[in-house]
Amino acid sequence: MLLNCIIFSAILKFKTNRNKRILKFLLLKCSLAILLPIGISFIILNNVSYSGESVNVIALQPNIDPYSEKYNMTNLKFVDLLEKLTYNKITDSTDFLITPETYFAESVRLPKFRTSQLRTRLDAIVGKHPNLNIITGVSFLDVFRDKNRAGPESNQYDAVTWYNDYNSAVLINKTDNIAQYNKSKLVVGIENFPYQSVLKPILGDALIDLGGTVAMKTTQDYRGIFTSSNGNYKAAPIICYESVYGEFVTGYVRNDANFLTIITNDAWWNETQGHQQHLSYAKLRAIETRRDIARSSASAWPPGCTSLRTRSPTWRSRLTA
């Protein structure tokens, strides 16, 4: 806006006076307006001192092709992969292990998760490292036959059966409580299908799937926080598309999140610029909230400033700590 005003004012003066000095002053003013803020920003960046308690995080980057691999593996196979990638990497000082969105994509019946083999396997990992907190993406289904339970975000399976489809993040640690957060900013047309009765017969499943099954997802109306087993850390479980919205992410901070996590399936973008732009949004959220971000995806971790402390190569299986 400032540059626009300077240029507009200079053009008006030049048209009146036809004095080339005006153009020289315009060039000088524009250069100062651009370079001065950049210079000040670099000075501030080089003098930033990080304070507060540090958190030891491992972010998983499994490099799973969502088009050919993700839905052809069972949840227990993904636990095997998790154990393989984290073997000898998790220590007693590791606070969090973070996996991508819907890492466990084989839908789990919500009431049965507590007693499932998946929960048992994850508990076993935590049992070896009592200080560990696992934040992972899980696809949940809650199936019911009570029509009165069906809400505007419920899906009807047949004449007597409905289900809620959740794209969730869960926290597993040494406490018996399981914290669950359901993705609440949905991809329109994929996870949030408006006017289904009209559009579904026309479009069918022609829309690309960016985060699980093409069905209406069930959301929640508050920004849940995951508290570590020792009570020192309060993580914001931001799921994929939610990180695009600054005010939405600020809601986690208002609920006392002292660091942010982003779990995402941005491999859906393949070789396009989509996953790069998604990563750039994460950096903006770090600047806005003054919070460090641990990001589990194809692109790894942007911190609470303008540069990446640690970044994994895209399309490689690895861990970032």
Predicted segments, located by residue:
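Membrane-interfacial interhelical loops
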Residues: M1, N56, R318-A321
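Cytosolic-side transmembrane helix boundary signature
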Residues: L2-L28
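Internal/C-terminal transmembrane anchor helices
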Residues: N19-N47
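Soluble catalytic regions of membrane-associated enzymes that act on cell-envelope
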Residues: F42-I190, T227-N232, P237, Y241, ...
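CN hydrolase (nitrilase-like) catalytic-core segments centered on the catalytic cysteine
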Residues: F96, T102-F104, K112-T136, G211-K217, ...
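Short beta-strand scaffold segments in enzyme catalytic cores
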Residues: N167-L171, G224-F226, W301-S307
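A short, polar/charged loop-to-alpha-helix boundary motif
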Residues: V187-L199, R316-A321
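Short, solvent-exposed cationic patches
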Residues: Q196-T213
